[in-house]
Regions:
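N-terminal, active-site-proximal structural segment of metallo-dependent hydrolase catalytic domains
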Residues: 1-150, 163-171, 261-265, 359-362
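Metal-dependent phosphoester-hydrolase catalytic domains
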Residues: 8-20, 25-58, 64-71, 183-185, ...
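Structured beta-strand-rich core segments of catalytic domains in phosphoester-bond hydrolases
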Residues: 72-94, 111, 131, 135-229, ...
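Structured loop/turn residues at beta-strand edges in well-structured enzyme cores
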Residues: 95, 127, 153, 177, ...
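Conserved beta-strand segments of alpha/beta enzyme cores
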Residues: 98, 156-157, 178, 207, ...
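Active-site beta-strand/loop signature of hydrolases that rely on acidic residues for catalysis
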Residues: 98-104, 116, 120-144, 161, ...
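Acidic/histidine-rich helix-loop elements
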Residues: 101-117, 139, 217-253
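Short, solvent-exposed loop/turn segments at secondary-structure junctions
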Residues: 105-107, 139, 177-179, 213-216, ...
Length: 362
């Protein structure tokens, strides 16, 4: 009987590994053709956790079978490193520039009180970043002028762009370096968009791309239901219904984001083919294992994967934890000490910070 149990568990472990591989490499599927399968990368940590449980089981009951989950981790090393990088500590060398990417959720200005200092704007100013890319940077009512004054007093060069349609979304760049030009990257979306800026960074033209790609459009009710579901406070029927509802929304958003990612990637490649240095920031609304991440990061370095540690969750509302905000750079930059800064929680996103050091031309 014990032998039957051992072999049954071994088969289950092998099945799990195949599923973990399918989920870990789901970003190679085009969401236009396989929207459901392409969204499975969000569930990768659940499969990792299950494989860790198998490690514990084999350590206790049959250590010679430990090779099965270990092999699974080895086969999934590329997506595992994307999702959960580990790097030695690195101090930014002299001459590095500091880059900040932050979805500020309208600076949370709806909830500001009279004479209150906006904590998000204060954080941006005190970050002392050289280049700041903000998403959802539109301000509400009378607080806008006060926030603008704080930011513009620190940053002499800035461009704030509203969405060309009816969306309230704004994208902004604040910089210590001159902004030579700016333009919108053309792709279809009713609510989201991407901006490209050419900056003069210490005498060199650098393309900076600021993205806010298609939202998953989860309503407050959706997020509240997900919160209740993760706490075990929904019935089985309600949980199944809500899971399908959320999954359908994720798949639909993926189908819209895929051509946006293609457009941004093509735009960046055009500049890279001309030899221009590139820094990419933004809220991608997609996981590190997604088609979106893979396409936009193609030929670039993910600064968090290269120099950060841990899962680095940037979205943190309603018990939804995922890294959807990124900083990428071309290979003429070396990233240092990239981190998700959890000190400021007024937005539903945490900011991402990284130091970049220009590398000598090869």
């Amino acid at each position: 009987m014990k032998k039957v149990i051992i072999w049954t568990v071994a088969v289950l472990n092998i099945i799990l590994i195949f599923m973990m591989l399918a989920v870990g490499y789901s970003g190679y599927l085009n969401p236009l053709s396989h929207p459901m399968w392409a969204s499975l990368g969000l569930f990768f940590p659940l499969f990792l956790l299950a494989n860790v449980c198998f490690v514990a089981f084999w350590c206790i009951f049959r250590w010679r079978m430990l090779w099965i989950p270990v092999l699974g981790f080895l086969l999934c090393f590329p997506p595992l490193r994307l999702y959960f990088p580990l790097n030695p500590p690195s101090s930014p060398p002299e001459g590095s520039i500091k880059v900040l990417s932050y979805n500020v959720m309208g600076f949370d200005s709806r909830h500001m009180e009279e004479n209150e200092v906006n904590q998000i704007a204060e954080y941006v100013v005190e970050s002392d970043a050289d280049i700041v890319c903000l998403q959802e940077s539109g301000k509400w009512g009378k607080w806008g002028q006060r926030i603008d004054s704080m930011l513009q007093a620190r940053y002499p060069h800035y461009v704030a762009t509203p969405h060309p349609g009816k969306s309230p979304d704004h994208l902004s760049v604040y910089s210590r370096f001159p902004v030579l030009s700016s333009e919108m990257i053309p792709f279809e979306s009713n609510q989201n968009f991407s901006m490209a800026y050419v900056l003069n960074v210490n005498g060199e033209r650098v393309l900076v791309v600021n993205n806010h790609l298609e939202s998953n459009k989860l309503s407050y009710d959706d997020k509240d239901s997900f919160d209740l579901m993760t706490r075990g406070k929904l019935s089985n029927y309600s949980a199944k219904h809500e899971t399908k509802h959320i999954f359908d929304k994720l798949a639909e958003a993926l189908k819209k984001r895929a051509p946006q990612a293609d457009a941004v990637a093509a735009y960046i490649k055009n500049y890279r083919d001309k030899g221009m240095s590139v820094i990419v920031c933004g809220d991608f609304n997609d996981s590190p294992l997604s088609y979106t991440h893979r396409k936009v990061c193609d030929g670039l370095t993910d600064c968090y994967v290269s120099s950060g540690n841990g899962p680095g969750f940037t979205y943190h509302q309603s018990r939804i934890y995922v890294r959807i905000d990124n900083i990428f750079c071309s290979d003429d930059w070396k990233p240092y000490a990239c981190k998700v800064d959890t000190k400021v929680a007024q937005s539903d996103h945490y900011p991402v910070v990284c130091w970049l050091k220009k590398q000598p031309k090869r």
